[in-house]
Amino acid sequence: MKIYWLFLLLATIICFWNESSARITWNGTRYQRKAYWSQAIIFFAVVIFFCGLRSGIADTGTYIQMFKGYPSSISGMDLKSVNKDKGFFVISVLFKQFISNDFHGWLFLITLISGVALMIGLMRYSEYFGLSCYLLIASTMFTYFVNGMRQFIVVTIFFCATYMILEGKWTQYVILILLLSTIHGSALILLLVYFLRNVKPWGAKMRTVIFLSLIVGVCFDKLFPLFGNFLAETQYK
């Protein structure tokens, strides 16, 4: 709990600091508020440091046991025995062989990648960087650094690479999503996001998507068992 209050205090300071010193820059199409990199580095350095040095929060214990069970060298890898997330497995084995067998370093590296990707994404796309930092802590969304870290690293890298969607870089986007799907298979659903880039807000297509989403939400109790049966024989059973 003390760490949470520390994060919240830091986020509040960054928020006020950013509001009092934000720069107004021209990004080629419009004026945009921009934070200073020093603010971003200070905030995320603290968050990454404490989250990266954890050893027993949420599902961290499961990941630690998973890491300990991985082979310590490439020669010991058997990809045929890995049913899911082979990219994550390979990265972990490479870490054990070339960097360290200590899970602390492994957890810190994953936290570092997630944190840097999130920081870059917020610096690129957030008009109110300080407020974004505050909401990250106040809403407890920062806990994804320590719970569900495979999903979170996929989400943060995707967020950082949003420019591929905005600039229509289809080939690069597909390659990235396919690579991310080797870390967590659910990343494949992000391929659909690309096709929403040209959908006009509140246009016919967008209203259709919203309508279908509402139907799924209302019928969730009936659809969930069917979805569970569909996944019964997959890696997410």
Regions found by a protein language model. Give the residues of each.
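Short hydrophobic/aromatic helix or loop-helix immediately within or flanking a transmembrane segment
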Residues: G61-S72, D78-S100
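Transmembrane signal-anchor helices characteristic of membrane glycosylation enzymes that use polyprenol
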Residues: M1-Y4, T12-R23, R30-A58, G217-V218
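Alpha-helical transmembrane segments and terminal signal-anchor/GPI-anchor hydrophobic tails
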Residues: G61-I64, F89, Y194-K237
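Transmembrane-helix signature of polytopic, membrane-embedded enzymes
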Residues: M119-S139
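Loop-to-helix entry region of an early transmembrane alpha helix in multi-pass inner-membrane enzymes
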Residues: K86, F98-I113
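Membrane-interface transmembrane helices that cradle and orient dolichyl/undecaprenyl
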Residues: F158-Q172
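Short acidic/glycine- and proline-prone juxtamembrane loop motifs at membrane-interface regions
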Residues: V146-F152
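Membrane-interface alpha helices of multi-pass inner-membrane proteins
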Residues: M141, Q172-F195
